[in-house]
Design a protein with these regions (language model features):
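Acidic, mature catalytic/reactive cores of soluble proteins
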Residues: 1-585
Length: 585
């Protein structure tokens, strides 16, 4: 049967902080990019079950299966058949472009492997050498090496039967055949025999650092999802630079069959800052700081301080392209690679960034960090002070530029946090006047009939207003905010979840947005409406499968996540909501 979003409840996510993979409970690798998150996929079964490549290990007989994590980022699949069972541990070796499928089976299994190069199947030259299967891109840029360590026999052009017992199936990536000759021959069964244990130890070291426990609280049921949220964010982190991508996938649609299909495998400043903040709030200061250091290193002193998004190595993304060779998930076209949002002006992102910097500083009192980046902080604040009246695309990346209230609020947040940070190291807060001017502008231009509207002369209320008290722009009990909150609850709160808005230039907004539900939970916690905050978390928890992964959008009718998966900033705001509820109650 064709994949649908309902299947995502049984999808697992693994990472080695270079790249990542999604795997279903049928032993099928749905998505894998080598050598890093934002590379072209080597397997894109998600986007085309006929032409997206295949890497499947499953019983030959009819089977049932279950998924669970052996350890963070080590995914265990158990198959049961009438003649016996099989267990597979799937993992990516930290620091290596090597995917291992560790098998212990009472029955024979079938292996299918046929990868993609340049988004095309069969776009390779195949050869075998010393028991290894070589798949070389026809353009010479990339070699995949498949090795079966254990008893097996070839049953077809790209199929093998794996005999019962202990087996390792190893998939390695090299940039070229020449690099394989230099490096690949060092990869052998002997030095991979302890790969599973070392990978478990690698992620276990993170687990040992978790200090927050929900045991004994009325949030106890959320402990597994809290831990999963942490490891999802860590799994979206690119270890060479510390940058954090938004999500591991591309072109999973908001609406099946529609065209809201985007590539999220990049470092959005906004998303990365929110995730860095969540890491710091959980006590993972080094990882949060590295993400912030990466963003500081991106500052452009010749214009707007930050682009909206970057590749994991800090290079820029130039537009997007359509991939005609893939049919798209549930026939959702176009399949997009790259992202045009890089060309937009988004004025909120520096606010999210500096708010995360301030959160790190408040937790660590690391004055040296602030001193080292004081010039960047001052430049951001000065540029925003000079340009705050510009129109922009806003947080929702709309094609129509407006003077969005949320963007102005986040500029205010940037100037507020810049003032506090620079004052903390003995500097002068010289942005007070501009902050007051911005606040007065929002009050004068973005309030209509006693409630906040999305932009001047608009009648629309969107869910960004929920963030205003979270970021300290307005008191949560302010009468204007309370009236706006009631409108959000009446018009955007549907079947237990919150929509961003009702309409945009593409059409009606068909799905709720998990971020907005988490904002509302944090608002309720500030208002001491704890039970309602908890219910929002329970609503999200009811959607997740056994692997505790959260998507970006929710189809409130079919009760499934849609869009790219798993979504990093949603996991981050789930963490933030948990901590807000604990702090405010």
């Amino acid at each position: 049967m064709a994949l649908t979003f309902a299947d995502f409840k049984d999808v697992g996510f693994i990472s080695n902080q270079l790249t990542s993979s999604l795997i279903d409970k049928n032993g099928n690798v749905l998505w894998l990019c080598f050598p890093r998150f934002d590379s072209d996929p080597s397997l894109a079964y998600l986007l085309d079950e006929s032409n997206g490549g295949v890497f499947r290990i499953s019983p030959i007989l009819q089977f049932s299966s279950l998924h669970k994590y052996t350890a963070p980022n080590v995914l265990h699949t158990n198959f049961k058949t009438s003649e016996g069972s099989a267990d597979i541990n799937d993992f990516l070796i930290p620091g290596k472009t090597i995917f291992v499928r560790d098998i212990n089976s009472e029955i024979n299994l079938q292996l299918n492997f046929n990868p993609l190069f340049s988004f095309h199947s069969m776009n390779f030259n195949y050869s075998e050498n010393d028991g290894k299967m070589m798949f070389d891109s026809k353009n010479g840029k990339g070699r995949l090496v498949l090795e079966i360590i254990g008893k097996s026999k070839k049953t077809g052009e790209f199929t093998w039967e794996i005999e019962k017992g202990l087996t390792q199936v190893i998939l390695s990536y090299y940039q070229s055949a020449e690099i394989y000759e230099l490096e690949g021959k060092n990869v052998s069964s002997s030095n991979l025999s302890k790969a599973l244990d070392s990978t478990i130890d690698y992620w276990g070291a993170y687990a040992e650092r978790i200090k927050l426990s929900l045991s004994g609280t009325d949030l106890e049921e959320f402990e597994p999802l809290l831990r999963s949220s942490l490891f999802t964010i860590l799994g979206l982190t690119y270890s060479p630079t510390g940058s954090i991508i938004a999500a591991p996938t591309a072109s999973l649609p908001e609406d099946p069959g529609g065209n809201r299909n985007w590539d999220y495998r990049y470092v959005w400043v906004r998303d990365s800052a929110i995730m860095a903040s969540a890491l710091c709030r959980l006590g993972f200061y080094m990882e949060g700081r590295r993400a912030l250091e990466f963003l500081f290193s991106m500052i452009d002193y010749s214009g707007k301080p930050l682009y909206n998004l970057y590749k994991v190595d800090g290079t820029k993304i130039y537009g997007e392209r359509y991939i005609d060779s893939l049919n798209g998930f549930m026939n959702s076209k176009p399949v997009r690679i790259g992202n045009r949002a890089t060309n937009q002006i988004q004025l909120d992102i520096e606010g999210e960034f500096l708010y995360a910097v301030a959160g790190y500083f408040d937790s660590t009192h690391d004055k040296e960090f602030i001193q080292n980046h004081s010039k960047a902080i001052e430049y951001i604040a000065d540029w925003l002070s000079d340009n705050w009246q510009l129109a922009d695309s806003g947080i929702w990346e709309k094609p129509e530029d407006h003077e969005y209230a949320h963007s102005k609020v986040m500029i205010w947040v940037a100037l507020e946090t810049a003032g506090k940070l620079i004052s903390a190291i003995g500097g002068l807060d010289r942005w007070k006047e501009t902050r007051n001017e911005i606040k007065n502008w929002v009050i004068s231009n973005c309030i209509k009939d006693g409630y906040f509207v999305t932009f001047p002369k608009s009648n629309e209320v969107d869910s960004t207003v929920l963030s205003f008290p979270i970021y300290g722009f307005i008191d949560v009990n302010d009468s204007v905010f309370i009236k706006t909150l009631k409108i959000v609850e009446k018009t955007l709160f549907v079947k237990g979840f919150v929509y961003r808005y009702n309409f945009d230039s593409i059409g009606k907004s068909n799905h709720a947005f998990v971020l907005c539900s988490m904002w509302l939970a944090s608002v309720y916690s500030q208002l001491k409406r704890k039970n309602e905050a908890l219910q929002l978390l329970k609503n999200v928890k009811s959607m997740v499968g056994p692997n505790n992964l959260i998507g970006e959008d929710i189809d409130v009718h079919d009760k499934v996540f849609t869009g790219n998966f798993p979504q990093g900033f949603v996991h981050a705001t789930f963490i933030n909501s948990i901590i807000d509820i604990l702090s405010n109650n």
